[in-house]
């Protein structure tokens, strides 16, 4: 409304119609074209997630929303989270298995070296024992009578060997001869062990006797005192 008088050529009805037009222009009705434009501009003007400050912690609703975005449709959220945890544990175990394998390999190498050392030490000890026994092979042969004077009776195994040779059964004769050789070697080893034990016991007895002689006094107390008095009398 105009204050005071109206301009020439205008009535109050004209002024009211102009004011209504101005109101319509200020607040126009939304059309379809305007709605589409508003939708485009609104989508572009929506604040993105990165526009928010990063220092603030996310709320539960935002975390749930992110989880639901990652979770496929038709699967509950708790099952999806459990699946993710299991997947993470599986990947960690796969990454940690090569270390355990390397440790096992190192342990197996150490065990092999230890077994080799033990076998080598056992072999060396067996060799030393065998060398000690071989020294006594045939040690008592000189006490046996000569072969001409000795009556030799064949054993059952020797008779079977002779029978196999007469029958031209070479394989059987070889097998029986091997058995005879092992038997003779066993007899030699048994005699060598007995001789070794005898020598060892004899040495121990000699050593103990020598130790007793060392411990025994050269003279008694009275003889020593008498000798001391005689030596003192010479200086008087």
From Swiss-Prot:
Residues 100-112 have a biased composition (Basic residues). Residues 122-132 have a biased composition (Polar residues). Residues 1-158 are annotated as: Disordered. The keyword Coiled coil applies. InterPro entries: FAM204A. Residues 22-40, 141-158 have a biased composition (Basic and acidic residues). Keywords: Coiled coil. Signal peptide: none annotated. Residues 101-167 form a coiled coil. The keyword Coiled coil applies. Transmembrane segments: none annotated. PANTHER family: PROTEIN FAM204A. This is Protein FAM204A. It comes from Mus musculus.
